[in-house]
Amino acid sequence: MQGFFWKTLLVVALCGTSSSLAHRPLSYGEALELALSVYNSKAGEESLFRLLEAVPQPEWDPLSEGSQQLNFTIKETVCQVEEERPLEECGFQEDGVVLECTGYYFFGETPPVVVLTCVPVGGVEEEEEDEEEQKAEVEKDEEKEDEEKDRPKRVKRFKKFFKKLKNNVKKRVKKFFRKPRVIGVTIPF
């Protein structure tokens, strides 16, 4: 009975120490590859994304037990997620979405954790384009209204109300989809 107790205690001690051992060193390049792999597998996108640019991190410490940060930009490729092709074979889409991402690695956690935040690039330019499109639509609508002057005022008011409603819905939908995507996963070391 006493031998069983010591064997059990030894197994429990080994399991406890193996989970608290230091993580495998992770170079900056490996961290970028892992972050991109996590994004492509967890973001729920139809297309794969590939690294466009990485901001060098001279303070990156592969042996750190604390948190590490990396910044990079990714772009949508022509490959679909279901294809499971290597990213090197995938070219960038001509008008593909460009995302600016920040990754945080927390090596002090057991198991280590990575959290990614990605936001679309060019939000201000898109808003200006949206405003120009809306102005063009308003001008077209005013021309149509001039042609349809014979309609009753009630119809004109309803038409104007529904146009405003439609534009507000469009704005909110675009704003909703511009929100950053945040992904958090544990790293299997």
Curated annotation (Swiss-Prot):
Prosegment location in residue numbers: 23-155
Localization per record: Secreted; Target cell membrane
Disulfide pairings: C79-C90, C101-C118
Keywords assigned: Antibiotic, Antimicrobial, Cleavage on pair of basic residues, Disulfide bond, Membrane, Secreted, Signal, Target cell membrane, Target membrane
Keyword Plastid part of the UniProt annotation: no
Keyword presence, Membrane: yes
Comp. bias regions, Acidic residues: 125-148
InterPro entries cross-referenced by the UniProt entry: Cathelicidin-like (IPR001894), Cystatin_sf (IPR046350)
GO biological process, one term: defense response to bacterium
Tissue: Expressed by the venom gland.
Region named Disordered: 125-152
Cleavable signal peptide: 1-22
Coiled coil (UniProt feature): none
UniProt superkingdom: Eukaryota
Biological function: Potent antimicrobial peptide against Gram-negative and Gram-positive bacteria. Adopts an amphipathic alpha helical conformation, that may allow to partition into the target membrane. Low hemolytic activities have been observed on mammalian cells.
Family from the record: Belongs to the cathelicidin family.
PANTHER family given in the database record: CATHELICIDIN, NEUTROPHILIC GRANULE PROTEIN
Additional observations: The putative mature sequence has been predicted by AMPA, a predictive algorithm for identification of peptide stretches with antimicrobial properties.
Protein name: Lutzicidin
Species the sequence originates in: Bothrops lutzi (Sertao lancehead)
